[in-house]
């Protein structure tokens, strides 16, 4: 029996328009009534995820910023921040590649270290209040997420090069078709879900997770039942326990219904 279910957002739980299908909220509440916790596991920050789940935000859990922010029932149970040294080295490396552009995030703000118009347009779709800067934030600013926008779509090649250059400080994972997440070593969606599992006293075999991209790799490998979307990257589907349908067909919601039916 599953006691904790985690789902990625873009390309997984969200539909093709980047929206939460309305039935999702009822499913989350129904799962909770049966003793099953639901967690959104995403590269997005906690504050952004709360906007997606406003009707049920206090009745669910969050593994946000790729595991750097972990919340259970609205209470923080884990947080990880980047060292200023690591961020400085990342900024220096990214600056050498004309196709790469760095975005940094603290708990509520987004910082764009670039003035390239294409980059700004892309980021503004999701972060309308982002602040454009030309120097790194002060070391007193707690950075919880770092992402790199790849303006030519060469995310796999770029992630490989960055990993070779900065593997001591980061783990790089493609996220979608244009982004690369720069994660702290040992911090991932898997480490975040592990904190939730410890908080609730839940075993790995009692956890199910859904994902579609390479920043879902660790969590899909960690949980007892890892499910890759039909639209997932081939490497993720290869290591998943199951492959389910597409996000545009609300496949995650269908799987949640099946879990509920098994509990009836």
Where are these regions (language model features)?
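Short active-site oxyanion
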Residues: 35-39, 58-60, 145, 205-206, ...
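Conserved acidic, metal-coordinating active-site core of Asp-based
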Residues: 93, 98-214, 218-222
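Active-site phosphate-binding/coordination module
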Residues: 19-119
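Short, acidic loop-to-helix structural element flanking the phosphoryl-transfer center
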Residues: 18-34, 79-86, 128-130, 186-198, ...
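Asp-based phosphoryl-transfer active-site loop
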Residues: 2-17
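Active-site metal-binding loops of divalent metal-dependent hydrolases
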Residues: 9, 67, 211-213
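Short, structured coil segments at secondary-structure junctions
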Residues: 55-58, 66, 165-168, 222-223, ...
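Mg2+-dependent phosphoryl-transfer enzymes with acidic/Ser/Thr/Gly-rich catalytic loops
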Residues: 1-4, 21, 181-264
């Amino acid at each position: 029996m599953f006691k904790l279910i985690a789902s990625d957002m873009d390309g997984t739980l969200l539909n093709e328009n980047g929206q939460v299908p309305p039935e999702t909220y009822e499913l989350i509440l129904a799962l909770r009534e049966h003793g099953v916790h639901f967690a959104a596991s995403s590269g997005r920050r906690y504050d952004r995820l709360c906007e997606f789940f406003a009707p049920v935000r206090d009745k669910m859990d969050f593994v946000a910023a790729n595991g750097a922010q972990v919340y259970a029932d609205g209470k923080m149970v884990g947080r990880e921040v980047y060292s200023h040294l690591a961020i400085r080295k990342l900024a220096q490396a990214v600056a050498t590649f004309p196709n790469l552009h760095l975005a940094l995030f603290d708990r509520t703000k987004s910082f764009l270290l670039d003035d390239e118009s294409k980059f700004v347009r892309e980021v503004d779709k999701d972060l309308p209040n982002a602040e454009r800067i030309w120097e790194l934030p002060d070391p007193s600013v707690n950075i919880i997420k770092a992402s790199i926008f790849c303006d030519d779509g060469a995310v796999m090649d770029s992630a490989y090069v960055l990993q070779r250059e900065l593997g001591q400080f980061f783990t790089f994972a493609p996220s979608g078709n244009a982004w690369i997440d720069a994660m702290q070593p040992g911090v991932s969606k898997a480490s975040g879900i592990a904190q939730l599992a410890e908080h609730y006293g839940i075993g790995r075999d009692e956890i199910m997770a859904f994902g579609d991209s390479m920043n879902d790799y660790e969590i899909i490998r960690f949980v007892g039942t890892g499910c890759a979307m039909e639209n997932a990257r081939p490497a993720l589907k290869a290591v998943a326990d199951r492959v389910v349908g597409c996000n545009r067909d609300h496949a995650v919601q269908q799987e949640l219904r099946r879990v509920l039916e098994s509990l009836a």
